[in-house]
Amino acid sequence: MILRSSIAETSEPLPVSAAVLQRSLLNWYDRHGRDLPWRKPPDVLDPYRVWVSEIALQQTQVKTVLPYYQRWFDRFPTIADLARADLQAVLKAWEGLGYYSRARNLHRAAQLVMERHGGQFPRTLAEAIALPGIGRTTAGGILSSAFNLPLPILDGNVKRVLARLIALPVAPAKALDRLWAASEAVVSLDRPRDLNQALMDLGATVCTARKPACLVCPWMAYCQAYQTNQQQQIPVSEPKAPIPHKVIGVAVIRNPQGQILIDRRPAEGLLGGLWEFPGGKVEPNESISDCIRREIQEELGIEIAVGEELIVVDHAYTHFKVSLHVHLCEHLQGEPQAIACDEVRWVTLAEIDQFPFPKANTTIIEALKQRFPDA
């Protein structure tokens, strides 16, 4: 299907005046905006709270973030508290939200805010973007919400709304300049905080990816995708490559005292700084048991006996999927060495909840607690 756009690339970025779009959207928002804690005083006036909410909402749904929000500030009430916290405590507080680089960046950025800005979140776009984990749209979201500055945003919801509004004939990733121009044109000088939040709410509740509720949309009369009956085809999606699937052998290694061996991943990279049960990828024509023995010898320098299967955990990351085949194992000989990790520890099952683990590993922990209820 050839998509049609009624707006030439060289013309105005919006199909009607910004004032018309602002008025209709803000009227809708005043009646239907979502009731979220980071939008209410005093939180909405606190850039630290807005900042944490913006980071947590990256690639994570609101309903998932809500239970974490107040717990985070109970643990780290101020930027100074976060900056001086141990990274392991920060990762533990983030446990379950995923995309742990966000927590590491929050921690490092808090330290930089203390060092460079006297503990006050910066008020300029350039200074905000200079902090780890903050790009243009996150900075715009923080500064427009906390300080009511007229800055555009372009998260996933807003891209979809604007792509439909202007009937964007190509995938959003191929026309970011046009979408930024549209977002900048539509932002309100009088109510930028509310306008940006209204855009996000419109995408989250009305202009959804599937089955958009066009008949109740405040922009229905101006939406070029709706007017040309293309709302189901826009935004244009690009073909996705097949997602690789990895089979992983995982060892829950126990010593005669009933302790369990865990290791901490390197600080950089996927799941950096988190603890896990050791193991690795199954090679072609290799059994799960042989994989586990080989990986433990290579990574920790010890010999083990591979026992019964405890659980199989299927988990999806952004760019690949894994199946973790978890076996109970017995430590035979050798002192564990941190060869391919940053640290190793023997811990009891009662102590294990003190350490931050990836979500897939927390499933293993629950299986262990059921298997050894008296440990």
Question: Can you name each region flagged by the protein language model?
Answer:
Residues Q230-E276, A305:
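N-terminal strand-loop-strand
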Residues L328-F372:
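NUDIX/MutT-family hydrolases
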